[in-house]
Amino acid sequence: MREIVLDTETTGFDPESGDRIVEIGAVELWNHVATGETYHVYINPERSMPDEAFGVHGIGPDLLDNPRPPEKGEVTLKDKPVFAKVGQGFLDFIQDSKLVIHNASFDMKFLNAELRWMGLPQIPMDQALDTLAIARKRFPGSPASLDALCRRFNIDNTNRVLHGALLDSEILAEVYLELIGGRQPDFGLSTSAASGAGGQDDWRPTARPTPLASKITDEERAAHEAFVEKLGENALWTRA
């Protein structure tokens, strides 16, 4: 089974208000195992970059109202292709595979808006699997952001200083496999027991309040002692 773990970065929250996609990142899974195949592209949104969005992902310093050269980790967009140049290639990559997305409704509305403006086929909503919904169902009332799930599953996200579509997809792939129990399943053992930490040394049987009475009769005990005495030096427990 092929799945595509996907993320986008945008200029804002609403494509119908003129916001656009500026980055797409995706990771391919086969039978819940990463293949190493990825899709990654930066996109010129053909508009300015709001300061708020830039603060999230650091993409497009050359499109700010006060344009400037990029600093470390920032990516310029004026020299990148517009969506019309990459849309078909994106569809060719995902094909009809299930799309694993965190907060899928957000990314899907942007992807389908961009595809609609190009006159390309829309992606059916049921092709997307929302890991945010899965997390909220599994852990009701708990934080379900990508960062929160990384903390829950002890997934290293120290490189995630700014949002980035490909990095977030790689992290989400690990989170997704944890959510479905597919990453190093422990057959119901706790994490500490499975890793060897907090194992048998931490477990102690509870003392029985009333000791059990022996069910061996006096005759049986005498017969056993006579049998042991008869074995003498041939007993296994006397051998070196």
Regions found by a protein language model. Name each.
Residues 1-125, 136-139, 148-162:
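Conserved non-catalytic scaffold segment of RNase H-like nuclease domains
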Residues 86-89, 175, 227:
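A ubiquitous structural signal for well-ordered alpha-helices
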Residues 87, 143-146, 221-224:
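Alpha-helix initiation and N-capping motif
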Residues 98-105, 110, 114-115, 145-205:
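Acidic, Mg2+-coordinating catalytic module of metal-dependent nucleases/exonucleases
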Residues 177-240:
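Acidic two-metal-ion nuclease catalytic site recognized across multiple nuclease folds
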